[in-house]
Design a protein with these regions (language model features):
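Transmembrane helix-loop junction
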Residues: 36-37, 43, 89, 93, ...
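Residue-level signature of transmembrane alpha-helical entry/exit and packing/kink sites
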Residues: 5-9, 73, 77, 101-104, ...
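Hydrophobic alpha-helical transmembrane segments in multi-pass integral membrane proteins
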Residues: 141-151, 187-195, 202, 240-254
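Residues within membrane-spanning alpha-helices of integral membrane proteins
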Residues: 6, 49, 104-108, 112, ...
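Transmembrane helix exit motif
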Residues: 58-66, 105-129, 240-255
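Selected transmembrane alpha-helices and immediately adjacent juxtamembrane segments
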Residues: 1-40, 125-173, 180, 258-261
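Selective hydrophobic functional segments
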Residues: 46-99, 184-235
Length: 261
C-alpha cells in the first residue's frame, strides 16, 4: 500500500470518528472512500464495520468514565438491537435504494425538526429515562436495519432517543455509541465469515476513527450541548442536501481522491 493512501485512510478516519461520535453519517464518507479506492461495495460495507466497532468502543469507554449515561439503560436497549442485528446480517435480500432514500430522508427530517424546535420539547435531563415497551420494538427494527445496511443507523437511534425518549443530546449520543458498540461485533462476524473484510484498509481507517472518537468524546462535555446541537445540525443538513441531489458527496469525495492520488 502506498504511503499517501495510508495517510488518506488515517486522516479520513479521524474526521469520520469525530462526525460519528458527535452526530452520525460518517459511514457515508467511509464507504464512498473505500469504493473510490477500488473496493467492491459489499467489501466496503463490511470493512466499514471495523472502524465502526473501534470508534464506538473508544467513545463508550470515555462516556462511561465520565458518567454520561446509565449503563443499565444502555444494556437494556442493546438486547433488541443485537437480535435485530443478527437477523439483518443473515438476510440475503437488500433494501431497495428508493425505499432506503425515503426512509433515510424521513429520519433526517425528524432530526431537523427536533434540532429546530427542541426548546418546545420537554427534555428529561440526567439519566432517569423511562424505557417504554415500544422503545424495545423500535430498537429491534433499528438493529435489523443496522445488520445489513448500517449507514444512517446513528440518526435512527438519535430520532428515537431525542424525539420519543426525550433524552438530551449528550446522553443520546452516549447511548447511541454504546448500543452500536455492543451490536456491531455480530454483523462484523458475518462479514468476516463471508470474506468481505479488507483488513489493509479497515485497520488504518479504524485507528483514525479511534483518534477522532477520543478527541470528540473527551471534549463533548466541555463543548456543551449547544455546540453538539449546531454540529449535528450542520451534518444533517449536508446529508439531506446530498440525499435530495443538491450536492453529491460521492462526486466531491471521488474528485478529492483523484487529485490526491
Amino acid at each position: 500500500m502506498d504511503w499517501h493512501i495510508l495517510v488518506i485512510l488515517v486522516v479520513s478516519g479521524i474526521i469520520v470518528g469525530i462526525v460519528n461520535t458527535l452526530a452520525g453519517g460518517g459511514s457515508i464518507v467511509t464507504v464512498t472512500m473505500f469504493t473510490a479506492l477500488g473496493l467492491p461495495i459489499t467489501v466496503a460495507n463490511g470493512t466499514n464495520r471495523i472502524a465502526v466497532f473501534l470508534q464506538n468502543l473508544t467513545s463508550t469507554i470515555t462516556f462511561i468514565r465520565k458518567g454520561m449515561f446509565n449503563l443499565r439503560h444502555g444494556f437494556l436497549l442493546s438486547i433488541p438491537v443485537i437480535i435485530g442485528n443478527i437477523a439483518g446480517s443473515l438476510v440475503a435480500t437488500t433494501i431497495d435504494e428508493k425505499v432506503f432514500k425515503i426512509c433515510f430522508g424521513v429520519i433526517l427530517v425528524i432530526i431537523l425538526l427536533y434540532l429546530i424546535f427542541d426548546n418546545r420539547i420537554k427534555i428529561k435531563e440526567g439519566h432517569n429515562i423511562e424505557i417504554r415497551p415500544w422503545h424495545y420494538l423500535w430498537f429491534l427494527l433499528i438493529g435489523f436495519y443496522g445488520g445489513y445496511i448500517y449507514v444512517g443507523i446513528g440518526y435512527l437511534i438519535l430520532a428515537i432517543t431525542l424525539w420519543s425518549m426525550k433524552m438530551d443530546i449528550v446522553t443520546a449520543n452516549a447511548i447511541k455509541g454504546f448500543v452500536i458498540f455492543i451490536a456491531t461485533p455480530f454483523s462484523l462476524a458475518v462479514f468476516m465469515i463471508n470474506g468481505q473484510i479488507d483488513y489493509l484498509f479497515g485497520i488504518p481507517h479504524g485507528i483514525g476513527n479511534i483518534i477522532g472518537s477520543l478527541f470528540a468524546s473527551h471534549y463533548a462535555v466541555h463543548w456543551g450541548k449547544g455546540f453538539i446541537k449546531a454540529f449535528t445540525l450542520i451534518i444533517v443538513l449536508i446529508c439531506f442536501a446530498d440525499l435530495i441531489g443538491l450536492v453529491s458527496l460521492h462526486d466531491i469525495f471521488y474528485s478529492m481522491m483523484t487529485v490526491c492520488l
